[in-house]
Amino acid sequence: MDRIVSSSHDRTSLLSTHKVLRNTYFLLSLTLAFSAITATASTVLMLPSPGLILTLVGMYGLMFLTYKTANKPTGIISAFAFTGFLGYILGPILNTYLSAGMGDVIAMALGGTALVFFCCSAYVLTTRKDMSFLGGMLMAGIVVVLIGMVANIFLQLPALHLAISAVFILISSGAILFETSNIIHGGETNYIRATVSLYVSLYNIFVSLLSILGFASRD
């Protein structure tokens, strides 16, 4: 009897996990599309950058709001507000590359981001490997990157900036592996939180690839 109950529970848990994964990918596709629209509008209208302080307040404020409302219907609205804002602040960055004739760099960064996401997701979904061991390493990597970013505010070293971008790509790729594994193993049951986590990883990979490829093109 216990085996029957256990087997039934496992199947229910697996179906629930798959549902979270499907909902996550669906919402992720919608937020990416919305972010692309706001980024395009920001680029075409040549909207100015909101500045460092407003960017940080808007980004972390909306992220906090999204996580706070993740279990409510308003969480979806918060997720779109967050991703839309990041799309808006991406516009001035894209204009910098377009004005320098680096449209091909943007295309390569998009392609590279899609490839990284596909490979990381496919690996976890195929192997179903538990990636929870990455948690500590990812946190340590984030701390190192933050220290490097603060240091480079004063040092202004191009080599350090490139190194930070490269590490950001590695950390974000690891975060995709970690979050996808967390979803399929039932560690993350909220698709809104999962969506935001994957979106931020994709955003960081794209911006970091832009930085690296743009630097290489200038040389």
Swiss-Prot record:
Induction data: Regulated in a Cpx-dependent fashion.
Mode of membrane association: Multi-pass membrane protein
Signal peptide location: none
Keyword annotations from UniProtKB, A to Z: Cell inner membrane, Cell membrane, Membrane, Transmembrane, Transmembrane helix
Organism: Escherichia coli (strain K12)
Phenotypic effect of disruption: No effect on SecY degradation.
Single GO cellular component term: plasma membrane
Topology Extracellular: residue spans: 44-46, 95-104, 154-157, 217-219
Annotated function: Negatively modulates the activity of the FtsH protease for membrane substrates. Overexpression or stabilizing YccA counteracts the FtsH-mediated degradation of SecY when the SecYEG preprotein translocator is jammed.
Name this protein carries in UniProt: Modulator of FtsH protease YccA
InterPro entries attached to this UniProt entry: Bax_inhbtr1_CS, Bax_inhibitor_1-related
NCBIfam families named among the record's database cross-references: PRK10447.1
